[in-house]
Amino acid sequence: MNAFAAPPMVSLDDARQALETTSKVVIDIREPYEHANGVAKGAKLIPMSQLGKRLAELPKPGAEPFLVICNTQNRSANIVGQLQSMGYTNASYVNGGMSQWARQAWPMVKP
């Protein structure tokens, strides 16, 4: 990846479809206190503060594609950029994040 290239992004609609119709992994990197309002059903919760210690829980670098979501997209875009530099070319972030998910009134579950 070019040092100045933007990390790969997917739309909120594509993320929802991935959770509902595929086995694509979606990683929610929000911190536990942010889960109080709910999480997308099927998302795997790995807080950003723990991600470095839990890399083994991610799909292997270059393997099946996976998505990273946070509250607005800022942290997830940053994390995907870092993951890409570590060889996780299969990672993309979700545009809009969980705040937009909630605005759409899409289903969420309590962790």
Language model features with spans:
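Short, surface-exposed ligand- or partner-binding patches at beta-edge/loop junctions that are enriched
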Residues: I69
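Rhodanese-like catalytic fold shared by cysteine-dependent sulfurtransferases
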Residues: M1-K24, P32-P65, N74-P111
